[in-house]
């Protein structure tokens, strides 16, 4: 477990307009909480997810009503759509025909080989990948009988069995997940899977819990896996508004420097030295930069002891003291501003920095 693994050679798999695996950045996914047959509600939720930074969205497809709604949903959203299928191969066929960008199935639980073959052939014809979703809580009986309880080896064995079914049908556009609610089990399963095959891995800690506890549990588990160099796409699973899943996922990726299009906030812990309303200012700035797709660090520091030094580590920042603040940019003081306009002035500088980034990006792209 202590050997660091880098997965640059992971097989690239196309999901809509995104490439999962290869040398591409990790993508963030979520799943809707609406009834999929309610097109209006589902599309509205997906639009909120898109705005929050979701890059791929999955919807449940438990019946024909849901399957029949997929085409209408697909036409009204702007990110790849994944259909989650269990047991009924006909729903997978309907989803593929509706134009989804990926299906999530376990080939071993949709029936006879001829049914699997129909799904695979349909997916091949439309270049639609398949995600094999192994879950510690629903492993096959024979695997539980073999190992006695859910184990990492059992999860990888299950994944390999499903992979073989697809490979035997000459299908290789495969993504694999090995989810568990036990953090240590998930870490071990993903570690072993990364050594067993080179298909892209979809990361997740399943049934992680509520917004607060589940967010921490997911961050701990996903962070440990990411620190091994493992993972190509991820979902934070919370018993909460799915938009909250995106917020946690973005922060996890930013913490590891794995997101090139997200701003990061640095703010100091509160203490008796603070002489400005740091908590209010930090929260407002965090909300402001949440949708800024620029890899900048923004610092909000509350005193003159550590503030100036820590602010210099950021691209832009402010260090407050005695009801006023020093604005820093790339380690240099820009100006001193009173607390009453501190946030507005910082926002202006953030906007200027973001605009400069986009101009440079356009200039670089024009030279290629």
From Swiss-Prot:
The keyword Membrane does not apply. Its EC number is 1.17.7.3. GO terms for biological process: isopentenyl diphosphate biosynthetic process, methylerythritol 4-phosphate pathway; terpenoid biosynthetic process. Pathway: Isoprenoid biosynthesis; isopentenyl diphosphate biosynthesis via DXP pathway; isopentenyl diphosphate from 1-deoxy-D-xylulose 5-phosphate: step 5/6. Binds 1 [4Fe-4S] cluster. InterPro entries: Dihydropteroate_synth-like_sf, IspG_bac, IspG_bac-typ, NO2/SO3_Rdtase_4Fe4S_sf. It is an enzyme of class 1 (oxidoreductase). Pfam families: GcpE. GO terms for molecular function: 4 iron, 4 sulfur cluster binding; 4-hydroxy-3-methylbut-2-en-1-yl diphosphate synthase activity (ferredoxin); 4-hydroxy-3-methylbut-2-enyl-diphosphate synthase activity (flavodoxin); iron ion binding. [4Fe-4S] cluster binds at residues 268, 271, 303, 310. It catalyses: (2E)-4-hydroxy-3-methylbut-2-enyl diphosphate + oxidized [flavodoxin] + H2O + 2 H(+) = 2-C-methyl-D-erythritol 2,4-cyclic diphosphate + reduced [flavodoxin]. Signal peptide: none annotated. The keyword Magnesium does not apply. NCBIfam families: ispG_gcpE (TIGR00612), PRK00366.1 (NF001540). Converts 2C-methyl-D-erythritol 2,4-cyclodiphosphate (ME-2,4cPP) into 1-hydroxy-2-methyl-2-(E)-butenyl 4-diphosphate. Belongs to the IspG family. This is 4-hydroxy-3-methylbut-2-en-1-yl diphosphate synthase (flavodoxin). It comes from Listeria monocytogenes serovar 1/2a (strain ATCC BAA-679 / EGD-e). The gene is ispG.
